[in-house]
Amino acid sequence: THTLEVARIARTIARGLALNEDLTEAIALGHDLGHTPFGHAGERVLDEILPGGFRHNEQSLRVVDCLEKEGEGLNLCYEVRRGILCHTGPDKAETLEGQIVRVADKIAYINHDIDDAMRGGIIYPLDIPLDISQVLGFDHGGRIDTLTLDVIQASRGQDEIRQSPACGEAMAKLREFMFEAVYYNPLAKGEESKAQDMIARLFEHYQTH
């Protein structure tokens, strides 16, 4: 569901900026193909175990280049491959479409994490600081709509994809809140440890069998 939401947000932004919607959607649909079970928790444990480390964006590129179609790969164009690789990490994609997916991914995952935390009883709607909600919206749909429209308006006529200062600052504050209230929450950390232990055990099993 995360990938489909990223694709929907990214395509909406691309349409609003009169950019290549198909290229944007292709990057979005491929961006997390190499992700581990349990998301970033799984990625961290594989990064510790594997001699060369592990990055899910690099694995996503490996999936489309080397693993699909029984090793033949999908023969994707440079722009799609580069967008997949650069949706996270220090390097930005050269295309605006690739940059759109990068920001759409951030919009989607933080809102998805909020929903998960609320379903798990870790946080409640009124826990989100009021100054953040007044800028971004008070529910999932409101935040998605606000952030999507903001990227379109802030990026129109520019040579890069960006957010307005107000929404960028609110997003940064929201991330800080999520780290304090959710990501470092003892309940969430306990579940993360279970997930990491499971992946480590599976890795050891497949290595020895």
Residue ranges and their predicted role:
Residues 1, 7-13, 18-22, 54-209:
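Histidine-centered, transition-metal-coordinating active-site segments
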Residues 3-5, 42-43:
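Active/ligand-binding-proximal structured segments within catalytic/core domains
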Residues 1-2, 35:
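Catalytic phosphate-handling regions of large nucleic-acid enzymes and associated NTPases
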Residues 23-49, 57:
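Aspartate-rich (DDxxD/NDxxD/DxxxD) Mg2+/diphosphate-binding motifs
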